[in-house]
Amino acid sequence: STLIKSILGLNKPLSGKIKLGIKQNQIGYLPQQSEIQKDFPASVQEVVQSGFMGRHKFFPFCTKEEKKKAVAEMERLEITELANRCYRELSGGQQQRVFLARALCAAEKLIVLDEPVTGLDPRVTANMYEIISEINKQSKITVIMVSHDVRAAMRYASHILHVGHDETFFGTVNEYMKSETAQRFLL
C-alpha cells in the first residue's frame, strides 16, 4: 500500500523519483475499503461519475461524453440497476464494483487496485478477479494490484512484484513460480 501511494503521488518517496510517463489524471485508483467509504452518502451514479472530477479543475459537472462513459462502466460491471440507490446501502461486493467503475472513469492508461477483494466472499472475489482480468485485456489498461492472495495473482497476473521483509522479486509469473522466493512463500 505504501508503494502504491508513492506511485500515485500520495506519499513522497524517501529518496529517488517515480516516473510513470503518464499524467496523474490518466490513473484510476481503487483504495482499500475503509469504514468511511462504506458509509458514503451519495448515489451510485454520483460516486461513479466522481471518477471524472480529477480532470476538471473548477468545473464540478460531467460532460455528456463522461456521463455516457459512466453508464457504460456501470453496464460493464452490472451495476446499472443500482444507479439511483444510496452507496452505503449496498453489499461489500456491490460497493467494490461501484468504486471499480469510478476508477475506470478516471483511468485512461493505468488502474491501481489496493486489495480490491478484501472482505469479499469467495464467489464475489473470483468474479472481481475475472472482471479485472477482462478490463486489462479488453480495454488495454495496465493494472497494478496489491494483493496478499499470491495464488490468485499467479492465475491472473502477467508479472509479479513480491515485496517481503528480506527479499524482493520482479518477473513473469513463470519466472516467479520457479524462483526461490515463491518456493519459500508457497510451501
Where on the chain are the PLM-derived regions?
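H-loop (His-switch) and adjacent beta-strand-loop-beta switch element
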Residues: 160-172
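H-loop/switch region of ABC-family ATPase nucleotide-binding domains
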Residues: 147-148
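Conserved ABC ATPase "signature" region
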Residues: 49, 64-82
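Conserved ABC ATPase signature
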Residues: 86-90, 94
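Helix N-cap at the start of a conserved alpha-helix in ABC-type nucleotide-binding domains
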Residues: 122-124
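Catalytic Walker B motif of ABC-type/P-loop ATPase nucleotide-binding domains
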Residues: 111-114
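Helix-to-loop junction immediately C-terminal to a conserved catalytic motif
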Residues: 8
